[in-house]
């Protein structure tokens, strides 16, 4: 079991500092970190390309202590795409001119 809150804390902290705020109208909750999303980037629904290129976040990600060979943690070097993250952040990018405009209304978190 991976806990990206432990090994991917640096990008998660950037995400929280930049985008978490009071007074949003909606909260979108994920129920587990995807293997090619939050497990790689520390960001909820963290599809690598969209986290890096649209949200403007990138930071070092460590390897978990008990890394599984079939689910390696590559951080922002991961070339696989998280489908749910691509859909969520892709929709946000289509609807909002900037990430800041999106996060004025909604926050995304993983339970």
For each feature predicted by the language model, list its residue ranges:
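A polyanion-binding, active-site-adjacent surface
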Residues: 1-111
């Amino acid at each position: 079991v991976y806990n990206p809150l432990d090994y991917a804390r640096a990008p998660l902290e950037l995400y929280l500092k930049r985008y978490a705020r009071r007074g949003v109208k909606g909260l979108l909750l994920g129920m587990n970190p995807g293997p090619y999303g939050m497990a790689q980037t520390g960001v909820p629904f963290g599809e690598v390309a969209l986290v890096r290129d649209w949200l403007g976040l990138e930071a070092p990600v460590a390897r978990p202590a008990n890394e599984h060979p079939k689910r390696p943690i590559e951080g922002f070097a991961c070339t696989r795409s998280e489908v749910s993250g691509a859909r969520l952040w892709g929709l946000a990018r289509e609807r909002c001119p900037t990430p800041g405009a999106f996060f004025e209304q909604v926050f995304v978190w993983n339970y």
